[in-house]
Structure formats: structure tokens, C-alpha cells
Amino acid sequence: MFSQIGAFLDSALLLLVAFFAVYRLVLVLCRWQRRQLDIPIHI
């Protein structure tokens, strides 16, 4: 039972880190695109 909880926590942490990384990447890409085009982008 404890091993299942540990595996679930590991996968949840991995998902959280992956989501945060993708979120940061999207923010950087939007900022770079806005700087390139010089047009305000509404999300």
C-alpha cells in the first residue's frame, strides 16, 4: 500500500514538474513572439 502511494506521489510530482516546464516554455515563446512581431497578443 505504501509503495502504491509512493509511486502515485512520484508520478504526480513528475506531472507537476512537466506541466510547469511546459507553462514556462509557452510564456517564453509568447514573449519572444510578441517581441518579434511587436503586436500585443491576447490569450
From Swiss-Prot:
It is found in: Virion; Host cell membrane. Coiled coil: none annotated. Interacts with proteins GP2B and GP4. Keywords: Host cell membrane, Host membrane, Membrane, Transmembrane, Transmembrane helix, Virion. Belongs to the arteriviridae ORF5a protein family. Its main location: virion. The chain crosses the membrane at residues 2-22. This is Structural protein ORF5a. Minor virion component that plays an essential role in virus infectivity. It comes from Porcine reproductive and respiratory syndrome virus (strain Lelystad). One of its GO terms (cellular component) is host cell plasma membrane.
